[in-house]
Amino acid sequence: MESLLRQLSICNELIAQGPACPVGNIAWLNEFCATFLDFASELKAHLPEIAPRWGAPEGGNNIEVETIFLCLTQVVTCITQLERTINIESKFGHETTPMTRLHFLDRIDWCVRRIYVSLSQLDLHQESGAADNLEDHTFVELMDLALDHLEAFMEGLGNTTSNFLYIEEENDTNDACQLGSIINHIVRHALAFANVALEADKKALSELCETLLSECTTFLEGSAELNPGHRKLEALSLERALYGLETFLNEALLHSIFASLVELENTPINRLRHALQEQESESGLTEKLVSDFDTNMDRIQQIGVLAIAFSQDVKTKTIVRSCLASLESLDACIVPALQSSALHHADILEHHFNDEMLIFRNLIHDIIDSRSLVNNYLDMLAESLHIHIAGKSVPREYLLIVQMGSVLAEHFRLPVNYSALSDDGKRVHKDLILILRECLAAVSLATPVDPKRIVKRLKILYSVLAKLRDVIDKNVHDSVFNLSSRRQITNATRTLLRSCKSKSKRQRSYVKQSQDSVVPDPHNYTSSIANSISNDGDLISFQLTEILRIN
């Protein structure tokens, strides 16, 4: 441990030299990379000793280890951007990018210091054997904890001979927390998402949280005089409230994913940049664009938090966290940068934003189950057609629903999703792309089109998507419909994850299920560095990315 901390101290000293280095001088960054590479290699070799509980069934979710993985990934990301910055400096001069250099140096410095703190905490945890905190658990982990409590309680009802009924606490650390506290944390996660969810979903999420709290209170305050049958009904009601909240939250999550990705297409960062530079003539529009951008960034953060919760792969979790960290860091400075006259500073931050967003989008598409995404869009499309029949639709709603269909096209553009389709599925997918193009052309024309013609195409789109859903359904494993136990029947309704190696006993159908979850290469996360190898700094960045692969 002392050797690791000493190397981190050297890294801090090298980073401190960064702001004062001459124009185009990459030697100091190379030296930092070499030192950091030594640190990462040693950390990888000694991780089992430093964090013996990491990866173990009884304590694999160590927040300090996850923080270290995040910081390692962020350092590599920032090094890549620093290389671009230094190359621009060597071409145009130091005065072009001082803010950019400081931005990435500050992020690296923070990450290195945070790794130092996390390693120190791990050392303390080894000595004290500190237990996990509920604050460190994800929404999915909390759901499993609550359901495990209820499952143990109902099993105990069949064995008890006493009138005094209670929840038996397990020796396991995760089960040592009281059910009421677990439910409160679940509600906290749900309300955090509800704050950024679409308006149509906010009220329902709030009501489901109230129902869950009410059922929890009824269950926890249940009288000892009640018979086991009555207590079991209370437990089942609480379990039903938990599943109801999770199911609706995931439907709302998919709604938010459609809305956020469409918003990114409608308001790309370069359009925001243009609007900010022309703000004198369109100040009202500019304010709205900035407000919408901020709202969408908040929504993307919550989407990412839930994506991390549903993903069971360490690499995927780490890269999603890194994307969120980059986007959060950029959120505070990108609008001022786009408004400033520092063109190179704005160019680099815009490029960085687009890179991180592309990685994030592809990871989200890799995590989400194709069938759930199709079903969710079919529901929205059916509602849109119903609104038209009621005579309440407007042209913008047609455009929006078709743009959401383009999110499906983007989903299947990812090789891992397209390759999962059968031959019939690929034929139907081809039809989907054709009808989507027709629909988009119809709703995008400057000349108004008869709504009946648009609706006719939307109905064809619905029919094609229904066929695609049916084809995907045929590929679903029979295990989803296994009727061997009550728990499996209940879980079949849990609608985002590929079948993956999960610590959870409950499989979520809204997430892809895969044999061995492997982080996709959405933007060729490593090859994008390898392809630009033109100097020592590029080479070391590539080596760092390779060494930081997590087994």
From Swiss-Prot:
Keyword Protein transport (UniProt): no
Protein's cellular compartments: Cytoplasm; Cell membrane
GO biological process: cell migration; cell-cell adhesion; cellularization
Transmembrane regions listed in the UniProt entry: none
Key words of the record: Cell membrane, Cytoplasm, Developmental protein, Membrane
Coiled coil: none
Transcription in keyword set: no
GO cellular component: adherens junction; catenin complex; cytoplasm
Membrane topology, record value: Peripheral membrane protein
Main location: cytoplasm
Known role: Required for the cellularization of the syncytial blastoderm embryo. Involved in the localization of the actin filaments just prior to and during plasma membrane invagination. Sry-alpha together with nullo and bnk may provide auxiliary functions, by acting both to stabilize a large and dynamic microfilament structure and regulate its functions.
Name of this chain's protein: Serendipity locus protein alpha
